[in-house]
Amino acid sequence: MSEKILKYPGSKGNIVSDLIQLLPVHKVYLEPYFGSGTLFFCKEPAAIETINDMDSDIVNLFKVIRDAPVSLANSLIATPYSREVYDNSYEYRENESDVQKAVKFLTKCWQGYGSRGCASKVGFKTDISKREKMYAV
């Protein structure tokens, strides 16, 4: 599996191998609580797959990854790692595109720390050792 793009509360990353062994052979797969999608992306594909999440930021992010990956990547490359950008990522505007919303969501997740679900503002990451991962999309 490639580098995950989203650290998210409740991620199954540490136990995904065990969970995959417990999955029965299946033709239909439903993931009602998608989150970071760790299990979905690690398991074998099924003929019919449905994913969902109550968090509209998660749903929007993965729609943008599916529908406009180049636009998202270009926007992320142009996004500076700064406290100002991080603070502004919590301000949503009505006329923002789905790509802009996805960039803001990832900015909160990547540049912040201690935020539950990347939704509540706790703090800005000042360490630079992992900063380059933000630009690895």
Residue ranges: model-predicted function:
Residues 21-91:
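SAM cofactor-binding core of SAM-dependent methyltransferases
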Residues 1-14, 22-23, 69-137:
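SAM-dependent nucleic-acid methyltransferase catalytic core
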Residues 17:
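Active-site phosphate/pyrophosphate- and oxyanion-stabilizing loops and adjacent acidic/basic residues
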